[in-house]
Amino acid sequence: TIEAEENQTLLEKLNREELINTMQFLQRCAAQAGYYYNLQAPGSEFGTMKLQTAENDDPIVAQVKIWDNKEHKIRTRFSLRRLVTEEDGSLSVKLPCGSYEAEVTCGPEYSTVLVPFEITKDKVTTIKARLARIAHLTDHGWTAGDLHHHSIYSSPAYGGTDPVIETPGQVCRSMKSLGMQFGALSDHHNVLNHEEWQRQNNNFTPIISKEISTSNGH
């Protein structure tokens, strides 16, 4: 078909490095959607982990790092998954069966919570993480933010070159999970993110911007 011929033509145009970059981009897209694979363990059995984070009784956006306990403790090398909860503090991810540990954080103003858990075939494991505030930096005149970040609008899907798959909303939650109160989303050569970025104003100050890159660099 025409579509198949177009795909074949695209593959023929890609060199080795471009093909690898494309495969890595697609792998990140799958990971963002909660799908993972392990080439060394085909046919692995999976279960689901559901997490709820809170400060006191209020949900909080948090960063969650997950690693395999066995790999971490025995082999000294491990596969780390870095995820971010939704605005309501929830997270759901499918994982191969086994023993894991989750590290839940929300920047330097909050405690770090470590939660061990087990994944069983076709079962849902529910865990909770209550974060305690240990500092109030804004009381001392300090605020945190990121003035250089990109979203999917800088990716090949929109004519860019950066292997980024996060939407503006996901970028905002990522910043908030690190304890930031403001941020600039500076995609390359376009303002496609501006409308969506300006809506990310729940306990956050979005700054619209654009990055111009020339043949000589930034």
Report the location of each language-model feature:
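Extracellular beta-sheet/turn segments enriched in Thr/Pro/Gly and aliphatic residues
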Residues: L26, Q32-P42, E118-L137
